[in-house]
Structure formats: structure tokens, C-alpha cells
Regions:
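Short beta-strand-to-loop junctions in surface cap/lid or active-site-entrance loops
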Residues: 16-20, 27-38
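Alpha-helix capping and helix-loop boundary segments enriched in small/acidic/polar residues
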Residues: 49-60, 88-99, 121-132, 163-178, ...
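Loop/turn elements at helix/coil->beta-strand transitions in domains of secreted/extracellular proteins
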Residues: 38-40, 68-71, 115-118, 139-143, ...
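Primarily recognizes the serine-hydrolase "nucleophile elbow" in alpha/beta-hydrolase
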Residues: 106-172
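Cap/lid segment of the alpha/beta-hydrolase catalytic domain
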Residues: 33-113, 150-165
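Generic beta-strand/beta-sheet core signal
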Residues: 30, 45, 75, 122-124, ...
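The feature captures the conserved acid-bearing segment of alpha/beta-hydrolase catalytic domains
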Residues: 143, 155-214
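Alpha/beta-hydrolase-fold serine-hydrolase catalytic core, especially in secreted/extracellular enzymes
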Residues: 1-24, 184, 191-314
Length: 314
């Protein structure tokens, strides 16, 4: 962890943690500048776009939430940004991404200043998949916001989302709505739009999830913000809804954020990719790093001659 930058109400550091021996998760750690006894923590994965960790909207949501009292870890999707030890579309990318998210969670919970009862996660598109998958299998995620991804009819357009496969096999079939339902009874906000596979959310996916939450007696823990005139992104109106939900359920500093839903992001300075990179000439990738996906597969004892769809049959 290095290159601490003091910003307006928050700090940004460049960080790499070891997911397993020789495989590194690269990201940025956003912290509140104001000292507190305990902080909420938020995992911030992203979707499919080159260098997306460096984009304005990932920086904006991470910095805003840090300014309001959360430690936020924004990290690269496997095969994107600085995570170049393997291709993204490799057979076990879903496994690697899920494991990476668990390791990010492990790291955040290892910080003595983090409140283990106030852990959130949010991402858009492929980051939304990472959000509802980890929330489904790890009860340590207390509040989740999958954005523009929960769909009853679309598994995800990439091997990292549906390639294992986890949705359909010889003896079962499921979908992402049932995965999202596994968040119950924990607070969950589903954000959807009118221009992608989440267009039916108010009439299809959300009513199903409402029934699941009602069966736990916690209907008030589930919300849907549907933006019918918007497209597939994690834009300002979606971030605004996410901010309010996290502030409410993670008990962030509402005095700074909920004055007439004051979610102004103008205080945030967007940093260049060069200032956010973990590995450079001064801080190169460690010498024990696995160099390619063959080395990764061999280290994890996966056979390298099988089709990706045959890895998980036995």
C-alpha cells in the first residue's frame, strides 16, 4: 500500500493484496479523512470496461462514500486494469473473481477500525454480478446494491458470470434473481433501468424478491429504484440512490449527505490512472507473481486440457 493522497474529506491509497500465493488483487483504498472509532467498509467491484477502476464513476462513488464515513476498496476485475496475470475470459474467471472478492472482504475485516456489522458491497453490470454472488455465499456482507444486472432471463454475457456454469446443469436450473434472493433478510437495493435486461424488474424480478423478503418478515429491507428512461451504467441518479441506501443501512454520516438528499459530488477530484496505479517502476509486481494463466491453473491444480464447461461436472 502506497502513494497516500489527501483529498477533500477523504484519502486515496494504491493497494495490492495477495489473493493466493503469487496472484494479486490491485485496487485503491478510499478512507474518510475524519477520524472515527469505527468505520463502515464497502467493496466496490466494477464491470466490463478496460481500466474501469480508473473511470470517473468508480472514483466518484468510492470517494463520496469515503467522505461520508466508509472505508471503500475499489478493485480490478480479473484480466482488467492492473490484473493482467491472466486473461479475463479464462475458464475459471468466475471462481477467481469470487475468491478475490472474498479476499478483499477478509482484508477489510482484518482492519481493527472496521465495524464488522457494517459491511456493504456494490457494483454495476459485471460488478453487480460480483456483488450478488458474494452476498449470496458470504453472510459477512450486510448490505448489498447490485446495479443494472439482476435479471430472470439473462445470466450474464461473459464466462466470468455464467461460464462455470452456476445457472444450469444436468440436474438443476436457476437464475440471477434466485441468487439475489439469497441476500435476504439483509438489506438489499436493486437498481434497474429501461434499456437493458433489467427493464422488467418492477414487474418480474422485484415482486419475486418482495415475496422472499416478506417470508422473512422484513419487507422494509428490500428496495428497487427503477429508472425507466436511463441506460446500462452506474450514472449519477443510480449513485444517488445507492448513497441514500448505504447512509441509511450502514449508518454513515447523514448530516453530510441527507440534507434534502445532498449528494453533490463536486468536492471530488478525479485522479489520473497514473496516480492510481499500484505497480510501476518504483513498486513493481512482486517477484513471486505467477506469470500467466497456465501457471495459475497449475498452481490451483486445475487440468489445463479440458473445456471450461467440463471443469465443474465432477
Amino acid at each position: 500500500i502506497h502513494s497516500k493522497k489527501i483529498m477533500n474529506g477523504y484519502t486515496v491509497e494504491n493497494i495490492a493484496i495477495e489473493s493466493f500465493p503469487g496472484f494479486y488483487i490491485t485496487g485503491n483504498l478510499y478512507r474518510p479523512l475524519e477520524e472515527q472509532k469505527k468505520y463502515a467498509a464497502i467493496l466496490s467491484p466494477h464491470g466490463h470496461l478496460k481500466d474501469k477502476r480508473f473511470t470517473d464513476y468508480v472514483q466518484l462513488r468510492s470517494a463520496f462514500l469515503a467522505n461520508k464515513g466508509a472505508i471503500v476498496f475499489a478493485y480490478d476485475m480479473v484480466g482488467y486494469g492492473e490484473s493482467t496475470q491472466v486473461r479475463h475470459k479464462m475458464p475459471i474467471s468466475m471462481l477467481l473473481q469470487t475468491w478475490n472478492s472474498k479476499r478483499v472482504l477478509d482484508y477489510l475485516l482484518s482492519l481493527p477500525e472496521v465495524d464488522q456489522n457494517r459491511i456493504g458491497m456494490t457494483g454495476g453490470s459485471g460488478g453487480g454480478t460480483q456483488t450478488f454472488v458474494l452476498t449470496a455465499i458470504d453472510q459477512r456482507i450486510k448490505v448489498s446494491i447490485p446495479v443494472v444486472q439482476v435479471s430472470a432471463h439473462f445470466f450474464g454475457g461473459c464466462v466470468c458470470e455464467s461460464g462455470m456454469p452456476v445457472h444450469k446443469a444436468e440436474n438443476f436450473q436457476t437464475n440471477n434473481v434466485e441468487f439475489a434472493a439469497l441476500a435476504a433478510p439483509r438489506p438489499q437495493l436493486i437498481i434497474s433501468d429501461g434499456d437493458d435486461w433489467t427493464r422488467n424488474t418492477p414487474n418480474v424480478e422485484y415482486p419475486y424478491l418482495q415475496k422472499v423478503y416478506a417470508s422473512f418478515g422484513v419487507s422494509n429491507q428490500l428496495e428497487n429504484v427503477h429508472l425507466a428512461n436511463e441506460k446500462h451504467n452506474y450514472g449519477y441518479s443510480k449513485r444517488k440512490a445507492a448513497y441514500a441506501f448505504f447512509i441509511k443501512h450502514l449508518k454513515l454520516d447523514s448530516s453530510k449527505a441527507l440534507n434534502v438528499i445532498d449528494t453533490d459530488e463536486n468536492f471530488i477530484q478525479i485522479l489520473s490512472p497514473e496516480r492510481l496505479r499500484v505497480f510501476n517502476k518504483k513498486t513493481p509486481r512482486p517477484i513471486n507473481a505467477l506469470n500467466n494463466e497456465l501457471e495459475v491453473m497449475q498452481f490451483l491444480k486445475f487440468p489445463t486440457h479440458k473445456s471450461p464447461y467440463n471443469y465443474y461436472k465432477n
